[in-house]
Amino acid sequence: MIERRLTRSTVVRGGLALAAGGTALAAWPRETISARSAKQDAEILKFALVVEDLQSAFYAAALDKGALDGELLEYAQVVAEHEKAHADHIRTALGSDAPVAPNFDFGDSVGSPESFATTAIKLEDLGLSAYNGAAPGLTSGALADAARIVSVEARHISWIRDIVGKIPAPRPTDKAISAKQAQAAIQATGFVR
């Protein structure tokens, strides 16, 4: 058994490490968030619905194309159900304020197992990052709902990364992006018509 001795130098080093960690955490970039409100929740949920509709339509298109088999097919079938359930849940929460789903065209991104997997990773990462970026602006009730969805989104990205032989969780934390960044990323896909 290794014995640890508490010396003045270990206490000082520990205190310096703690102070440095606190300074680094204080420097963590934060977006300015307006006061949380039900109205802001609705705006965030409207955008989350676009992300979920995009993902849901992508998996449906991939299944319709019929280019998948084995583990990728199983992944697409399971995740298609999840994404549809997420979109339905948000649509129900928004009620009559829910926007109509945009039209999407996924072109060659669903034409082969490789292009499907590459696109799935990008879309799942986008969704996860968008939820993480929106979280600070949500009221506690909406945040709890979003947490139940984002935890599943994290499983999706880990699963598809594992299928293609990538590290399932390559970073100790997931990135967060602003709504503007997420909107730009969605437009950059070229999938929205």
What role is predicted for each listed range?
Residues 2-6, 13-193:
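All-alpha RGS (Regulator of G-protein Signaling) helical domain and cognate RGS-like helical scaffolds
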